[in-house]
Each structure stands twice: as C-alpha cells, then as structure tokens.
Amino acid sequence: MSNNTTVPTPANPAGWKFETRQIHAGQAPDAATGARALPIYQTTSFVFDSAEQAANRFALAELGPIYTRMTNPTQEVIENRIASLEGGVGALLLASGQAAITYAILNIAGAGDHVVASPSVYGGTYNLLKYTLADLGIETTFVEDPDNLDEWRAAVRPNTKLFYGESVPNPRNDVLDIEPIAKIAHENGVPLIVDNTVPTPYLLRPIEHGADVVVHSATKYLGGHGTSIGGVIVDSGNFDYGADPEKFPKFNQPAPGYHGLVYARDLGKDSAFGANLSYILKARVSLLRDTGAAISPTNAFNIGIGLETLSLRIERHIENATKVAHWLEANPQVDKVIWAGVESSPWYERAQKYLPKGPGAVLGFTLKDATLEQTRDFVDALKLHSNVANIGDVRSLVIHPASTTHSQLSAEELEKIGVYPNFVRLAVGIENIDDILADLQLGFDTLS
C-alpha cells in the first residue's frame, strides 16, 4: 500500500463501502472501557475540564457536549454515521421526523418568507406547510404538477427561501426529478430540501443529485423496527448562505444569543472548522437549544442498531415489494398498482435513473370497483399485515390512507395525490413472500 493512501477509520470512513460505514462510521471502541458496542450515555449533562473549556463551548469556540438537549455522545455517533451514508458534512438527530422537517425549514425561513413545494408529500408535511407554518407567517406555494419544471420556475417570488419535496413521496409513489429542480432552486439562489425517508441513502442519495439538505423520519427505515421515534437533518455543506446576505439575514447578521457570532461567516465555508457547518450548527445551537425537540439517547441507540442492518433489510424489502407488485398487477380485482418499480408507472424510467436498486417498499393499489366500505373490509381481513400508521418496519403493514393518514385533506387535495376511497397502502415487510401473498389473498376473498 502506498504511503500516500489514507486508510479509512471510523472517524474518517470515506474509503469504506456503504455496507461497512453503516456499521462502523462515527464510532470506535469506547476509550475508557473498551466496549465494542455503542454505549448509551444516559445523562443530562457533562463535566467540563475547566471554566475556560465551559466558556469556550458555550461560545461555540470549541465543539463538545454541554447538555443532552443539544447533543449527546450516543446521538453524535448516529449523526456522524447518517451524515456519512448520505454524503453530508453534518447531521442533527431530533425527536421525530416531523421535528426534523420543521427545523429544516425554520432554519432558513421566517415570518414574511415563502416556500415552493411539491404537493406530493406526506399528509403531516402538507399540513405543516399549508397551515402551521402559515400561522407563523410563512407562505407555501404548492406546484400543481411537480413533474412540470416550468411550474417550479413560475412559483418563485422575491421572498422565496427554499424548495421542498420528497424523493419518493408517500403514498403517491412518484419520483421527484431532483437534478433539474435543484438547478432551478440554485438559479434562484435558494436551497432544495428533500425528504429521503422512503428510499433511504442505500437506494438514493439526493445530495449527489444536487439537493442541499436531506431530512428523514428515522422512525421508518433507518431505525427499521418500529420501536423508536426520531428524525434527522443532513446538511450537504454545499449551499453558501453567505453569498446573499439580504436573502438570508439570519445567517449573516450577528446572533444576539451568541454575542455577535455570524453563522455564515464564523461557521461557514471559510471558517476554522474546515467545512461549511453554518446550516447544521445553526439548527442545533439555535432551534434545538430554544425549542427542545431533543431525541433521547436510548432512541438514538435504537436507531443506530437499525442502521447496522440497513442494506440487508432494504434488499429484502425491495425483493418482496417487487414480487407483491407484480402479483397485484396480475390480479383482476386490482385496478392499478402505484409503485415506480413497475413498468406501468409513469415514473418507471425516472426510477431507473435515480433508484436503480429499487424505489422503496411502500406501494399502493386501487381495488377495482370497490367502495370505501369494501376497501376497509379488505384491510380488516388481513391477519399478518398490521393496520398501523407507520411505514418502514420489518413487519408488513397496511392502511387505508383516505380515512386515516390523509383524512385531514379535502376531496380535491386527496385526488391530487392519488389517495382515492378504494386505495390501499402497503409497506412490504421482510417476512416470507409466500406468507405475505397468502395474507393479501384473504383481503381479496372479501371482495368475491
């Protein structure tokens, strides 16, 4: 081996493949005890070596643990691991996916600002953008057709601060055309935030296609076992918030809570940290500090356990989802299968570009000529599938979105995202495929 070759380590894992980094990135054996597994640091606070060190940490002159509301060593390992898997410079693990989405937006936009978003998003995100953020003075324009790039261009205003979309939306299962949308965002001087929950970085890394910030509900496939709530923001470090001080004043004006610190100048691309950390550190030391959506060390640990098998689980999820989708397509009682992995999908070709290993394991289908009541009966007949609001579990899951996860939307809004009364959503698990198909047949038997 050449002396010039950098040997990968947990602290610098760039030379390792994805499957290795999901296990090792960010964590070496515990220096004090030699513990091989990640310790759970179940503590509220951390002892400072000196009064000077304490002062430096509070002033952000030195990075290190202060209080578990802001960071914790267990949490930090998982943040570094997810940042490595997504290709970002840093990450912030939070109490839920909804907290991650909220912080990702509020870190940039405030009262009087404007967001351009795809309408094809999770129901909770749609509500956040349309109602809750509107209460805070942030207006969102949802493009009618996220595949129409001209609509993204036309929606931009002088006060637009960011674009937002989901890589593979739940439950419409279209595929966001990240590269041209990112280009339009950058032409207008704003970042693109992409929710990558459904595919995970094993199937798609939005930063490689131009996204600036990636968010996840870590509750789903990153954790993978339906045990722990969490969310994460990953920053690419590529967007320079200091390039337009007028558009991003919160990054370019002195922060009153930190004695004049200027995020873009002091933590940005030319800072002493060697990377543009202005976005991710601002989210931590301002939003998280002040509003407190902190993840518990135990939940961070559980999500880390899930990450260790991410690639193996996703491969099995995709294998089963592919078989379920083709089985459904061959069923005369099915009107339409909604999944970008089947050739009948309008987004099949785009999925081949962005997601060659598969578009995730969340799929939907409509029952031919079924009423809302018959569709609910279908769901109730299943025994192996769990009727839950979650996705991303090793277990196979089912739900009727029109009366549950998306019930807050109007009939017109439901139609726009493809949630019809006869629509069923599946999150295909990793059980034996024969058992999954046999259980789905129980539902079809109720229609006969």
Give each language-model segment a name.
Residues 63, 89, 299-303, 308, ...:
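Short amphipathic alpha-helical segments
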